[in-house]
């Protein structure tokens, strides 16, 4: 699990990539 700066939100690597590509 990776932590995204700006909040305690937790994203999996796949979810993080999907959000970053939006």
From Swiss-Prot:
It comes from the Eukaryota. Belongs to the BetVI family. This is Pathogenesis-related protein. It comes from Capsicum annuum var. annuum.
């Amino acid at each position: 699990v990776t932590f995204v700066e700006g909040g305690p939100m937790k994203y999996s690597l796949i979810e993080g990539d999907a959000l970053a590509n939006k």
